[in-house]
């Protein structure tokens, strides 16, 4: 006879988390492996945790791609890598004026965090100073939180960014340590962890997440969440692979909308007090169930991503309003 799996009490598990009882890896795997018919119960349970810590607030973030393509790394998922044949715009650094203009566009889009992103392995000291010049002007003229994502950092560069007023530094783990060699050969998983730690040591809030759907196992997905817990990442972007044509992963099967929802819920259970952001691949992977994602997550990007299009800001604002949620005001 086929063994009947005992149905979990997801709501009880959520209240345990609210009472600061951490879930186990087995609990996290159970969320990911739950029958699709349970997904609404799981999202409702995740919302108990999300609402306890964040109420109905949704944080909006906006990206500016200040340097596109021209990257020497061989990350298999990335359209900007040296091995990518994807037809993307390639350009060197935007001027400081353009970066500052982007900050004011972020405000028009009701974003509270402005993310300055550049392709490449690591920035030169001259490039860091270029970013710092723009950051200082943005800090003088707006109340935006500023996040930077410039590649690997050394201690001096991290300290300079912190002194300039950079609030957050993004450096994703991308995938599980044991899966890393299958997506990149030009740097290691430990290299990425090192930069997250350097940013934190400099006093910058660490932002680190993953791209789900790159061949990792269910168990590895759960372990990624616990690794981010260990690193104490304050903000966790959950990206879902967009299999871009011209990249080595172009044929990779993308996750279903329900699989994406389970990832978001699992991440909320494991990291209950952290900002969970639905990031790249939100529109293409979650599709018509995007609104449900915000029952676990409390943050999204508004507008376009690095090389892929997002939906119009008005659509995001409308989605948030329709849910009865509120956009978190831009404030430090």
Curated annotation (Swiss-Prot):
Q: What is its EC number?
A: 2.8.1.6
The record's annotation in InterPro entries points to:
Aldolase_TIM, BATS_dom, Biotin_synth/BioAB, Biotin_synthase, Elp3/MiaA/NifB-like_rSAM, rSAM
Q: Which SMART domains match?
A: BATS, Elp3
State which pathway it belongs to.
Cofactor biosynthesis; biotin biosynthesis; biotin from 7,8-diaminononanoate: step 2/2
User: Which HAMAP family does the UniProt entry name for this protein?
Assistant: BioB
Q: What does this protein do?
A: Catalyzes the conversion of dethiobiotin (DTB) to biotin by the insertion of a sulfur atom into dethiobiotin via a radical-based mechanism.
| Record-given protein name | Biotin synthase
Q: Which gene encodes it?
A: bioB
């Amino acid at each position: 006879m086929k063994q009947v799996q005992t149905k979990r009490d997801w709501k009880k598990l959520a209240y345990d988390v609210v009472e600061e009882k951490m879930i186990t890896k087995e609990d996290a795997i159970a969320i990911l492996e739950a029958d699709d018919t349970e997904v609404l119960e799981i999202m409702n349970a995740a919302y108990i945790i999300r609402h306890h810590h964040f109420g109905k607030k949704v944080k909006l973030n906006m990206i500016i791609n200040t340097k596109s393509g021209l990257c020497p790394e061989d990350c298999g998922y990335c359209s900007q890598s040296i091995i990518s044949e994807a037809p993307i715009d390639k350009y060197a650094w935007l001027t400081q004026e353009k970066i500052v203009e982007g900050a004011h566009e972020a405000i028009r889009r009701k974003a509270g965090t402005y993310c300055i992103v550049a392709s490449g392995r690591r920035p030169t000291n001259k490039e860091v100073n270029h970013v710092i010049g723009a950051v200082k002007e943005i800090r003088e003229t707006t109340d935006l939180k500023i996040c930077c994502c410039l590649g690997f950092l050394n201690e001096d560069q991290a300290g300079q960014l912190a002194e300039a007023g950079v609030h957050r530094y993004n450096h994703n783990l991308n995938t599980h340590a044991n899966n890393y060699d299958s997506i990149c050969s030009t740097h290691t998983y430990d290299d990425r962890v090192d930069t997250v730690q350097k940013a934190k040591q400099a006093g910058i809030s660490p932002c680190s997440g993953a791209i789900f759907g790159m061949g990792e196992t269910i168990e590895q997905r759960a372990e990624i969440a616990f690794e981010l817990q260990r690193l104490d990442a304050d903000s966790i972007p959950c990206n879902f692979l967009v299999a871009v044509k011209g990249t080595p992963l172009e044929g990779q099967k993308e996750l279903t909308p329900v699989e994406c929802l389970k990832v978001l819920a699992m991440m909320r259970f494991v990291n209950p007090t952290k900002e969970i952001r639905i990031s790249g691949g939100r529109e293409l992977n979650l599709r018509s169930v995007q609104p449900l994602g915000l029952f676990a997550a409390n943050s999204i990007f508004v507008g376009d991503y690095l090389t892929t299009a997002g939906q119009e800001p008005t659509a995001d604002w409308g989605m948030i309003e329709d849910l009865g949620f509120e956009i978190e005001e831009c404030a430090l």
